[in-house]
Amino acid sequence: MGRGKIEIKRIENSSNRQVTYSKRRNGILKKAKEISVLCDARVSVIIFASSGKMHEFSSTSLVDILDQYHKLTGRRLWDAKHENLDNEINKVKKDNDNMQIELRHLKGEDITSLNHRELMMLEDALDNGLTSIRNKQNDLLRMMRKKTQSMEEEQDQLNWQLRQLEIASMNRNMGEIGEVFHQRENEYQTQMPFAFRVQPMQPNLQERF
């Protein structure tokens, strides 16, 4: 029983599509190698998967094959791309040259060729630049003053806290000294003979003895 004809259309199932791609890709690359060997042909095959991954085979240098293709067909594959790239490069060069000229004018160089209107525009540009510089300078000064004020306030707060700690330490030391003094006084009075502890306000007590 012969094989049925396979309908050529996109395989919807992604797994089946990947399996079919791998098999047929390997088959194409194998055939390309075979024909290059059997027939001494110059073959180049490039395959891009839907994922963007590339597979290739080239019997000789791909650059040599492309050069031969250009010579035989008279067409270059990247003429349009190169033309767009050249245009972009020329535009960048022109913009750079104009910027260099404007920079020299802003420095006061090469201004003899400028007409009155161009000189007025240059003056406006310089005035605007000077205004921007002054505004930026004022902003920086305000920021520096604000930062200095904040640092001074923080320093004052730290000094106040330090004074409070010193006062608390001094009070604590004075309290400890007072406690030691009272303790020593009590011990001294306890050890003193009774006769020496009689108050001078009552001299008659000694006469009674």
Swiss-Prot record:
Its job: Transcription factor involved in the genetic control of flower development. Acts in conjunction with DEFICIENS (defA).
Domain of life: Eukaryota
SUPFAM superfamilies listed in its UniProt record: SRF-like
GO cellular component: nucleus
UniProt cross-references to Gene3D superfamilies, sorted A to Z: Transcription factor, MADS-box
Tissue: Expressed mainly in floral organs and, within the flower, expression is restricted to petals and stamens.
Protein name: Floral homeotic protein GLOBOSA
Residue stretches making up the MADS-box domain: 3-57
Something else known: Mutations in Glo cause transformation of petals into sepals and stamina into carpels.
Source organism (scientific name): Nicotiana tabacum
InterPro entries for the chain: MADS-box/MEF2_TF (IPR050142), MEF2-like_N (IPR033896), TF_Kbox (IPR002487), TF_MADSbox (IPR002100), TF_MADSbox_sf (IPR036879)
Location within or outside the cell: Nucleus
SMART domains: MADS
Keyword DNA-binding: yes
Keywords of the record: Activator, Developmental protein, DNA-binding, Nucleus, Transcription, Transcription regulation
One GO-annotated biological process of the protein: positive regulation of transcription by RNA polymerase II
GO molecular function: DNA-binding transcription factor activity, RNA polymerase II-specific; protein dimerization activity; RNA polymerase II cis-regulatory region sequence-specific DNA binding
Entry-linked Pfam families: K-box, SRF-TF
Domain K-box: 82-173
